[in-house]
A protein has these predicted regions:
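Active-site neighborhoods and metal-handling regions in enzymes and metal-associated proteins
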Residues: 1-450
């Protein structure tokens, strides 16, 4: 960050507590850029702001051009009103808080109280003074403070807004390649997620026949996420029957019926805030019907084809193209396409998108859709590098009202999703130990439910 923005002040807020209802807040979760730069996870630290102050070249931290200071609200003494009366930050209400020295020791950063933040952000701001770059729309108070100072100082507001957008873009791009520690945390997230899938299989008999069986599934996975991680990485999709044809079905209010398929898309967020993102489609009764197996195998073949080409040097977009070639071939073989496979795969065709409308892959890390602000040429058109982690998740979705497919296909949705690490000479499927083939899934479910 220092090398990218020499001579400029960089302001990265963690964010504020968000109200769920009246005086009840959501559990705090810091902005991913803040977590990435500070190494803080779990619920650290509401209202905190990381400020990188420019220095003379080489005079900053570790020979960089900036010094970094973490501003936050530290432990309040028992002789303060805050300790007893502040339900958001008082230790009597929420438990112990870190001291300035404690968080400095933990992060290796300078620390200071929030009372010093305004001066740190606003000093020397002028049209010809210190330029400030802000991770905007993260903390409304910081946004308002800097907007007022920029206006008063005569700073070009359009140029400042563009600089802020570039900063968010760059901070997102920083996460495209994971280091060894990040990969280790993602392995832990994947392991906890796999344990959660096993919990769901054990809970399936209890879900069957319940009016809200999908909630039984959701609850079983959530318990594991809170037991082994910080939280869910995203709202669990527990979609049975026709609900599996709804890409982001998170109401999970449906029943789970014998003979249906259950699409479970879920991930545990580690205490470090790195998350897994895995999907399996399971036969509720423990065995696939012939048509379910046929559709599932087509999706599995597409996923395997995409994985087979993963290696450094190929472009990210090639994964989707490879998976689509397989799915289009299967759809054509089933007689579902109104045109040839060649026409369907053309830019003008895309007829298969009726049944597979989403992308095959997305980056994964601190956000389930990580690096989302990265430039197109580094993401979709980007070249794969060792250390990148992303999903491969093709699917087929045949809605129950879709008269363009045979009746026995209707109401079936299948998605298979794994978390993939690019290595020096290929790739590793981080979630490969979770059964993937129809036979493996049937045997796995039988063993867990025995």
């Amino acid at each position: 960050v220092s090398a990218r923005f020499p001579g400029e002040r960089i302001v990265v807020p963690a964010g504020r507590l968000k109200v769920r209802s009246n005086d009840t807040d959501y559990r705090f979760r810091a902005h991913s850029a803040f977590a990435h730069l500070t190494g803080l996870g779990v619920d650290h630290e509401p209202d905190a702001v990381l400020v990188l102050e420019p220095t003379d070249p080489g005079a900053g931290d570790d020979g960089t051009d900036h010094t970094a200071t973490l501003y936050f609200r530290p432990l309040a003494g028992r002789d303060t009103e805050q300790f007893y009366a502040d339900s958001r930050s008082g230790e009597f209400w929420i438990g112990p808080r870190p001291t300035l020295a404690g968080l400095a020791a933990r992060t290796g950063l300078r620390t200071a109280g929030l009372e010093e933040l305004e001066s740190a952000i606003t000093k020397n701001v002028a049209a010809d003074g210190t330029a400030v770059r802000l991770l905007a729309e993260t903390d409304q108070d910081v946004d308002a403070l800097l907007a007022a100072v920029r206006t008063e100082a005569g700073v070009d507001l359009a140029a400042a807004a563009e600089a802020d957008a570039q900063t968010a873009e760059f901070l997102s791009e920083l996460r495209l390649v994971k280091d060894a520690w990040e990969v280790e945390r993602m392995r832990a997230s994947v392991a906890a997620t796999i344990a959660g899938f096993e919990d769901v299989v054990r809970a399936l008999p209890r879900a069957v026949g319940h009016d809200r069986g999908e909630r039984v599934v959701e609850g079983a996975f959530f318990a594991r996420a809170r037991l082994e991680g910080n939280d869910l990485g995203y709202d669990t999709i527990a979609a049975s029957g026709n609900n599996a044809t709804i890409l982001h079905w998170i109401r999970n209010t449906g029943a789970v019926r014998p003979g249906e398929l259950l699409l479970l898309d879920a991930g545990v967020e580690d205490d470090s805030l790195y998350t897994a993102d895995i999907t399996r489609t399971l036969p509720v009764s423990g065995t696939f019907t012939d048509v379910q197996r046929r559709i599932y195998q087509a999706v599995l073949d597409a996923a395997d084809a995409a994985f087979a080409i993963v290696r450094p040097g190929i472009r990210f977009r090639e994964l989707h193209a490879e998976a689509m070639r397989v799915l289009v071939d299967r759809l054509d073989g089933w007689g579902l396409l109104p045109v040839s496979a060649e026409v369907a795969l053309s830019d003008e065709g895309q007829h298969h998108r009726r049944w597979m409308p989403h992308g095959t892959s997305h980056h994964l890390g601190l956000d389930v859709h990580d690096c989302a602000q990265a430039k197109r040429e580094l993401y979709l058109d980007g070249v794969l590098e060792p250390g990148m982690v992303f999903t491969i998740e093709p699917g087929l979705y045949f809605k129950e009202e879709d008269l363009a497919v045979p009746e026995d296909y209707r109401g079936i949705g299948v998605r298979i999703e794994d978390d993939i690490l690019v290595t020096e000479d290929g790739a590793e499927n981080l979630s490969a130990v979770l059964p993937r083939t129809p036979d493996e899934i049937e045997a796995w479910m039988a063993r867990l439910q025995a």
